[in-house]
């Protein structure tokens, strides 16, 4: 796909998709546009982004998209579904209605989210059915610990193989305030959004390669290449005027009935994970192996492009930004092209024994 020497070809390729609610439209638009570019270059090939990566990891909406890609869906298919269904997941409501509802219940019903996920990954598909390695973070509310849903790419992995993907997808996207915790019957546990612990899963993706993929890949840091796609939300912070109001620092005003608290938590740990990744790569002289694609939304637009704004204007803006960034980067950035030299080898392990 590119006149690049074999030396430049990545040995292990990781796709990492950040969380961000409705802003995931930006993420999937980037991936879908790259597919279109590759399809134009290779009209006789069935181009699917997921086929080019040895590990796909994602959080929240990024986790849903990661699972969709791992099932063999194209990014273009997922883009179409999300654009059509996002308005059902995040229906427009007056802010006063949201405010009142958040006092005693989640703002949004999880049913449209489940229906959308079923369209993307199927209702019965399990981790054992996948031929692409995946890792999806979530928070196990029943134990108070993070949990990572995975394909059985480590021979000792047995817990998640028979687990349905829809449970992992609903678990990683159950953002507090917005959606109710997801109960996974097979694990007998309640889950909340993975963005509370790893909104950018790139660093844990790198560690996964060295720890639980080592039976397939005996590699060093310089052999692992990470493509990380953001959701235009990395620079969020509370306004100085809001923070300076000493009498209005409670849950309702300062934290916006939980919305600002969730966003602050996700943004802070996103920075933390990215910085840990960069320090780790720098230590091993492998900084050039990491490519981060994202944008910072201008101030006026930022107030409109939020986690739960799925209006036509917001989705169209996010889609346009994603497509533009994909075209510019693919034309100018050889590092991006190197991820798509050739498909990765499919993964399949069937000799897993039952072990908790």
Curated annotation (Swiss-Prot):
Protein name: cGAMP-activated phospholipase
Function: Effector phospholipase of a CBASS antiviral system. CBASS (cyclic oligonucleotide-based antiphage signaling system) provides immunity against bacteriophages. The CD-NTase protein (DncV) synthesizes cyclic nucleotides in response to infection; these serve as specific second messenger signals. The signals activate a diverse range of effectors, leading to bacterial cell death and thus abortive phage infection. A type II-A(GA) CBASS system. Phospholipase that is activated upon binding to the cyclic dinucleotide (CDN) second messenger 3',3'-cyclic GMP-AMP (cGAMP). Degrades phospholipids in the cell membrane.
Highest rank taxon of the organism: Bacteria
Alphabetical keyword list: Antiviral defense, Hydrolase, Lipid degradation, Lipid metabolism
Record motif GXGXXG, residues: 19-24
Provenance organism: Escherichia coli (strain TW11681)
Domain named PNPLA: residues: 15-206
Keyword Phosphoprotein: no
EC number: 3.1.1.32
Molecular function (Gene Ontology), one example: phospholipase A1 activity
Reactions it catalyzes: a 1,2-diacyl-sn-glycero-3-phosphocholine + H2O = a 2-acyl-sn-glycero-3-phosphocholine + a fatty acid + H(+); 1,2-di-(9Z-octadecenoyl)-sn-glycero-3-phosphoethanolamine + 2 H2O = sn-glycero-3-phosphoethanolamine + 2 (9Z)-octadecenoate + 2 H(+)
């Amino acid at each position: 796909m590119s006149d690049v020497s074999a030396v430049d070809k990545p040995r292990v390729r990781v796709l990492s998709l950040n969380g961000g609610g409705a802003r995931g439209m930006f993420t999937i638009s980037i991936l879908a546009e790259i597919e279109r570019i590759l399809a134009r270059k290779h009209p006789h090939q069935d181009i699917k982004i997921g086929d080019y990566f040895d590990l796909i990891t994602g959080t929240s909406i990024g986790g849903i998209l990661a699972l969709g890609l791992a099932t063999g869906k194209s990014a273009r298919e997922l883009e179409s579904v999300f654009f059509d269904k996002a308005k059902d997941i995040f229906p427009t409501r007056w802010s006063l209605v949201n405010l009142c509802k958040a006092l005693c219940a989640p703002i949004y019903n999880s049913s449209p989210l489940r229906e959308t996920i079923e369209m993307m990954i199927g209702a019965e598909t399990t981790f054992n059915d996948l031929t692409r390695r995946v890792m999806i973070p979530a928070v196990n509310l029943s134990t108070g610990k993070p949990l990572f849903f995975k394909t059985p790419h480590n021979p000792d992995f047995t817990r998640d193989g028979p687990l349905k993907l829809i449970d992992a997808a609903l678990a990683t996207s159950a953002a507090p305030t917005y959606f109710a915790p997801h109960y996974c019957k097979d694990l007998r546990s309640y889950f909340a959004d993975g963005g509370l612990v790893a909104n950018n899963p790139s660093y844990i993706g790198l560690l996964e390669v060295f720890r639980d993929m080592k039976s397939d890949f005996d590699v060093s840091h310089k052999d692992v290449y990470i493509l990380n796609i953001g959701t235009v939300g990395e620079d969020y912070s509370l306004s100085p005027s809001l923070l300076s109001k000493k009498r209005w620092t409670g849950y309702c005003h300062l934290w916006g009935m939980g919305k600002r608290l969730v966003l602050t938590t996700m943004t802070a740990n996103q920075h933390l994970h990215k910085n840990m990744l960069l320090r780790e790569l720098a230590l091993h002289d492998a900084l050039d192996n990491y490519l981060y694609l994202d944008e910072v939304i201008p101030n006026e637009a930022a107030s409109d492009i939020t986690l739960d704004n799925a209006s036509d204007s917001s989705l169209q803006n996010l889609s346009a930004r994603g497509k533009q960034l994909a075209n510019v980067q693919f034309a100018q950035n050889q590092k991006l092209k190197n991820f798509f030299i050739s498909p990765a080898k499919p993964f399949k392990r069937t000799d897993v024994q039952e072990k908790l």
